[in-house]
């Protein structure tokens, strides 16, 4: 019984008078339970929930009183009752990818107060890590990105942390480069990538330009939680402290472009025509400026989509994985007889491509196919190097691994999340040459002067590749077919299942438990060779009946290996979703993949 009394006290402690009242109310209930035989444990729990509801109402009222100062009153007023309630009944958590969420009131939403809380926790973390910390802050074109950047800068400056803040939006890869180039302690990118317009987020980077490691993220999270109630934060702004906020040197952007120019060298002259769209994001003006500096002018912008717009007004989807993101680019390509279509997501860390043939037929490429093409080109470009290495995520295609093996290129597989790729790059020996890294979710890196996905450096690289092919009367589609002929037609697909509520959570857990406790001998006629469990860091070889260790951080992922490829199951840590990845080299791939999906989720 003491636990529930203590729970009441903890729930109420931020409101002192309420805490005292509810604490003694809990004591009263506790005594009543002992003295009154008819007074049940369930009554106590019910009353506890009622009191928690009262507290939630008090909490909501306090937030509404501060709505005018929150920066998000407009967003809150546009939300449904359920969405509003979620903001008060949940809490934003700082995870391995930082924080991402909707605008609104409450600790479960992004607003002035929750941003101040995050910034204060981060300031304490940085000051605990080193003397005189420095940081670069970049932000994208989303609603409140610039305002959040200024709030964070003010809080950090108030704690004597030197902040470099640009006067305009920037791309995510530029942030990674800036941290490394300017030798700062940390970096912050304010973005929500391709999420809807009412989302934003904050990603934190370490001194190597990579997103924080799991351990560092957990430590930052504890510092943020220790701040307490965001409505109680008082951040005095003084002229002396704001002197810690410095203008971001424009020379850093110039250096970033020079690195890409040196990587590309030149783009061969051909009659290749390109259509490019930034999907209202940050890659314009830097990408057009970069292409022109490389003397490539044969491109047309989707003008309506190349203007920064936090509402993403002219796109159905700002996600390069979604073919709808290309709709206006396709129209322009038909009009101009273009060969290659390229789009980047709003923070320019991911990229999608499509090609148009002489008959006007559009072919879209998935992330694994783009990865295979880029790896193939990098293998051609680096033939003079020894000890070449390619890095990819564990759910990316076997196609690229086969291509690497065929060309005597070493490969490594890491957990999903580009910070794990960055970690591998950091661990490289001097003699190793990392020539390419990617994730199937359309994130690519050719040269590791950046330690995150970088669509900006990939745009001129893919154009150079396509331009070379055009000189020989070939296309990227032809080149992919040649890769298939060389190493086999590995094909890939992804099934994403949303399973809401308690029953959905039970089903997800049951699926994962079944594969762990009773692994199948075969799936749709494919003989299972091994089961890799990244939660236990073990791999079970079915044919040998042996278990060995996986040298990897823990993650709730299961991968089933066949001679023909693999399938992988990966539940989301933040949403009621589970993803099934299928990567196989077999006849009737689409039919087999659909049957595997039906078997697992029926």
Per-region residue spans from a language model:
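N-terminal amphipathic/hydrophobic targeting modules at extreme N-termini
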Residues: 10, 14-15, 20-21, 31-33, ...
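Phosphate-binding and adjacent anionic-ligand microenvironments
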Residues: 334, 338-340, 361, 381, ...
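N-terminal small/polar loop signature for handling phosphorylated ligands or for N-terminal nucleophile
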Residues: 136-199, 296-352
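An N-terminal, well-structured beta->alpha segment
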Residues: 60-152, 159, 245-272, 282
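Gly/Ser/Thr-enriched, mixed-charge loops and adjacent short helices
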Residues: 83-92, 200-327, 332-333
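Conserved phosphate/anionic-ligand binding catalytic regions in large, soluble enzymes, centered on
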Residues: 90-108, 278-286, 438-443, 448-456, ...
